[in-house]
Amino acid sequence: MSLHAARGGPHEDLSWSAIGRRAPRDVVTFGDREGGGGMRSAQQGPGAVRVDEASSASTFRELDEAFLQTQTKIWLGEVLHLRFGEDALVADLLADGELLFQVSKVLWKMLLKNNREQLKQSKVYIYERLSFGRSSGKYMPYSKVDSFLKICQILGLAGIDLFTPSDVVEKRNVRKVCICIRSVSKKSLILHLNVPDFDVVTYTISMPNYVVGGIRRNLEQTQYSSSSSSGYSPCARSKVLQQQIIFGGQNDQHEDTHYDSDEAESKLSLLEPEDSVNEDNFAAVLSQFNDAHNKGSEGYGESGCGKHGEKSLAESVGSLNIGIIDFEFMDSTPLIHDKESCSLLEPEDSVNEDNFAAVLSKFNDAPNKESKGYGESGRGKHGEKSLAESVGSLNIGIVDSEFMDSSPLIHDKESCSPLEPEGSVNEDNFTAVLSQFNDAPNKESEGYGESGCGKHGEKSLVESVGSLNIGIVDSEFMDSSPLIHDKESCSPLEPEDSVNEDNFAAVLSQFNDAPNKESEGYGESGRGKHGEKSLAESVGSLNIGIIDSEFMDSSPLIHDKESCFPLEPEGSVNEDNFTAVLSQFNDAPNKESEGYGESGCGKHGEKSLVESVGSLNIGIVDSEFMDSSPLIHDKESCSPLEPEDSVNEDNFTAVLSQFNDAPNKESEAYGESGCGKHGENSLDESVGSLNIGVIDSEFMDSSPLIHDKESCSPLEPEDSVNEDNFAAVLSQYSDGPNEGNEGYGESGHYKHEEKSLDESVGSLTIGIIDSEFMDSSRPIHDKESCSTGSAADQCSRTIPAKYELSSEESDSTGSHLVFDSGKNYLELNNHSVTDLERIYNGHATSVDQYVRGNGETLADHPKKEEAGLQKDTGTIAQHRDTLACDGESVCSSCEEPRRGLNGEPSDFSSESHSRLTPTHNTGGKLSMVSEHPVHNMESDMTGMASDSTNPELNPEASTRNEMDGSRSTDNPVEPENVAQDSATRGRPEGDAPRSGKGVLRSVAGGITLVGAVFFMFHLSAALLQKKQGGKLCDGHTISFGKICSEQRKGQEHGQRKRP
């Protein structure tokens, strides 16, 4: 059939039918219904039979076109996940080109996913256009249809299979468009694209969920009620056939394809996800299971998994009503028992408010007949009491979902398992469980105490547990608290023995009525002997307000030493059980206390523990506080304080009286271990009262409270001195000289003698302090060789002396100075000397009034003009003054070596004079003048001996200037030298040397001057070392004439040595 015939023109050859078979030549075929036509008659032979097939051919064509349009609409709906109306025509749907454009995008994405490498080399690209112009554009549908045609080309369709955009937009040839879409489907399947088959595609029947659930429920009900597993019953087969008739549709040959998955799922014997029970389908599931009982339940009880009798599953499950609950709650609760030998309760046997009556009647009607042997497995025998009395009512307010998972409510020991996971009891099933256990008591409860899990006598567990009332508690609290004792040899408390405010009286009466008969040997194991007193008196009520969950875990309340176990975890003391523990320890003292001190755990005598511990009152504290504070001393040879010996404001008096009444008899040897000897003084005097307000948790961690040095502990952390305790520490050292601990001071450290630690520390009151304060402060002196006197002692001695220095020593000493060329020496002389003030008898007087006269410039050598070196000599007016010693500067200079401006050690801080050297900076002002003429050159060498005056360029010279400025002068000067100084100050700054080579050549001439400067420093250090009084030195009259003569001699000497 030609294209012209398909478009409605006259057929040139109608011998090809719609199904592709060629018609016989002798049969006359008429044109199709689209008219047109002509008729071609074949050559007729004799006896030929003419058959007219015009009616059958037209009928087939009509059916063919209707099928194509129907399948096209279904195929487009399946690809695009759309649903079209029954009356919608394909021509109208495709006219705007939007559907074809959407199909092109879907196919393009599939092609990119499967054939990305091949499409990269293709020149045809399909992209989604953001806008096609105006929504009512005339040519917008043509552009969309063109995108679909490009996809057809990529898939490999030939030109004869394609259509033109006008066939769709103008609805000229809708049949050819449908045939093209069919070809696209076939090509896509060949390329393994996930598209439906055009020929077999059908509508996807949508059914409500309740209809599907009802069908499957009926199928499962029939199989559930069948006694054999041979397969479907005739009734079930009839129902399946009925469903196939209803939902089969016209294509019966595809029924197996549509319902394969349903039949496979219907063969499952278990419950599907849609069979979950909720409030809506509760009645339906209940009736379903009531009608289909499990007839094989008789053997179900023999497997040891609990016998439910003829009760249905609905009664054992009921309606699960979950309001606001965390998803992890059901996952974390250990409701399912996973032991192989015994599974009393299955997961569906959980008890709640709804199935309370059902479970009650179940257990009353069908008790476990093997309960007599239950006790033989070692799973706890509570006597004739019921489980409800041994558990009580668990009242939980706001609790994290991980609480039940983390709480160690289940005892996992093999020999003794009092409670199974399925035995959880709450307020709702209290009566049911009570009646259950009352009807089936355990008769072998007498042997329960022999298993070593604690013997409660005939008392029930509820008296030892009571009601657990938890307010707002972190989920990790129960997990982290060490409530369970896991030692093999001794397990005094089981998890159910926790004591609180509610069951205090019950536990008290329980332990009073049934004391542990083996308590006499309990003390021998080294775990503290409580005598005949009950556990309630030693534990009391644990009252926790708002506390972090890690507090109980991190606090080192348990002593882990092998030789000494003074307190077990249950021995914690607080404000509530203060009186109980006091009476307990007073009435039943530890008889082995004499040997207790010998183990190195501290000897408290006959005093009770409460006096050494007191009441621990914690308000709002960080959880890491107890963990980070190193309160436990871990040395083997000396353990002065145990964890229970912590002292605060509350137990201050108790600890004071305890240690005063019961001193440590081994204190004489205690000092010999190298841990500090405090004599016979009490602990309170050596510690004092520690008052901490709001403090960071890292404070105790960062502060070095534990001294770990073996041989030498000069200053403990408590000896740190700051502005607050300066007076106290000063008086301590002044009032407490070392009298009897001679060997202690010989190591080069301070000696505290018989003074207590409290006198050297005092009361440490900390308000709001940063945790890094104690860590960053460096209060400990770590030098071994330096142990000088105090600042007052150093400044209380005065040494007037005269020293001479030979020229050889001056030359050797001056060789350390380094010159730098090209520097203007006038800059040093420009420093103002009018601001200098002399200190005399505590009063400051300006020295400016003593400076008079004019200056004079020394004549330079003729050959030094090219170098530009100018040496100026200044004269100072006659004056006399004394310099008072500053205690702080002298003390600081004793401990710290001299440093340059950049932190480099100065050349003058050698061993010969490194101890006491003042480092007071005067900014280049007039310095001290000694009695020796050589020392007086310091004022002139400011402009002559150093050619690098800028402290940024020459830190060494700057250091020397700083040290020179620390000495003031009181000596008169000669009048003839005043003119020289004034002339030097009046010299312009622009007159600078032109070269630095002359400076290097005149070094020899300045060696004498340099030696004089260094000798002056050396002599100053010697004077400071031998001073005895409060004044550093006395001023003496110095003549500067000798200085000028020495300078001239040095110049002449340099001229002789020059080539």
UniProtKB/Swiss-Prot annotation:
Cellular component GO terms, alphabetical: endoplasmic reticulum membrane
Region annotation Disordered: where it falls in the sequence: 511-534, 732-756, 856-875, 889-998
GO biological process per UniProt: actin crosslink formation
Subunit structure and binding partners: Homodimer. Interacts (via N-terminus) with FL1 (via C-terminus), HIP, 19 kDa alpha-zein (AC P06677), 22 kDa alpha-zein (AC O48966), 16 kDa gamma-zein (AC P08031) and 50 kDa gamma-zein (AC C0P381).
One GO molecular-function entry: actin filament binding
Sequence repeat intervals: 269-342, 343-416, 417-490, 491-564, 565-638, 639-712, 713-786
Comp. bias regions, Basic and acidic residues: 515-534, 858-869, 984-994
Transmembrane segments: 1003-1023
Topology in membrane: Single-pass membrane protein
Compositionally biased tracts (Polar residues): 907-924, 945-958
Region (7 X approximate repeats): 269-786
Chief place of localization: endoplasmic reticulum
Residues of the signal peptide: none
Tissue expression from the record: Expressed in kernels.
UniProt keywords, alphabetically: Endoplasmic reticulum, Membrane, Repeat, Transmembrane, Transmembrane helix
UniProt free text on domains: The seven repeat domain is responsible for dimerization.
UniProt cross-references to SUPFAM superfamilies, sorted A to Z: Calponin-homology domain, CH-domain
Reported function: Cereal endosperm protein required for the ring-shaped distribution of 22 kDa alpha- and 16 kDa gamma-zeins in protein bodies.
Keyword Membrane carried by entry: yes
InterPro entries named in the record: CH_dom_sf
Protein name per UniProt: Protein OPAQUE10
Cellular compartment(s): Endoplasmic reticulum membrane
